[in-house]
């Protein structure tokens, strides 16, 4: 459940910005039907930053309910205050989620020791499996391989989503962790190379609109069929890149709407709808991928 193509799921909203239960069910059904390994609910792509704490919990629980055991659900539980991250995590202790994705604290830029103590404290307050999440472009904070190695010794810290796009990190981390520690790419464009170097899968934005392709690519990579996997990846490469032509999740929400997976591409301020220029770029990438 922690390998292969794991989708960083968008949070669908109606025109008033309320979470759409019917569209969420449609998205979950789509991923169940198309081989996605697991869902990350309310991560960055799921607009965690603009949901209230109550809404955050409600969306995760709604996702669990609608998934109904058909696909594993991972909850995003990151925060830039350790106590808040612990509180979010503990809310899901007996919920049925299979684990938590916890981003490095953003904005306050802790030291490496601060990062270690942050994740250690969270792990000590739950039995849920923890996936570390390193995305310096978003947080202003880079968790170094040596810190990951220290954290990997904690029993319920089982994986990392490494989203720097720096492939040398795969080698650096693998040298410092046990063989059962899971390495997940957080960068669709380099995910296949990441897996070829020993990674186990990807937490994917692209999978929101290309679930079957991403699942097939990851399966082929796991089986060592990299030529076949690369053929899929090359077709998707413009999409991997152009889904970030404007800040995530602006482009991918529009793409979901364009494919009929959600009813609207509504976002909450300060996120604004995609520009006409951005829409044209994403549309061309969807067409190149054979999705539109």
Curated annotation (Swiss-Prot):
GO terms for cellular component: cytosol. It catalyses: L-aspartate 4-semialdehyde + pyruvate = (2S,4S)-4-hydroxy-2,3,4,5-tetrahydrodipicolinate + H2O + H(+). InterPro entries: Aldolase_TIM, DapA, DapA-like, Schiff_base-form_aldolases_AS, Schiff_base-form_aldolases_CS. The keyword Transport does not apply. The record marks 44, 107 as: Part of a proton relay during catalysis. It comes from the Bacteria. SMART domains: DHDPS. It holds the Pfam family DHDPS. GO terms for molecular function: 4-hydroxy-tetrahydrodipicolinate synthase activity. Its EC number is 4.3.3.7. One of its GO terms (biological process) is diaminopimelate biosynthetic process. Keywords: Amino-acid biosynthesis, Cytoplasm, Diaminopimelate biosynthesis, Lyase, Lysine biosynthesis, Schiff base. The active site is at residues 133, 161. Pyruvate binds at residues 45, 203. It is found in: Cytoplasm. Coiled coil: none annotated. Its main location: cytoplasm. Catalyzes the condensation of (S)-aspartate-beta-semialdehyde [(S)-ASA] and pyruvate to 4-hydroxy-tetrahydrodipicolinate (HTPA). This is 4-hydroxy-tetrahydrodipicolinate synthase. The lineage of its organism: Bacteria, Pseudomonadati, Pseudomonadota, Gammaproteobacteria, Enterobacterales. The gene is dapA.
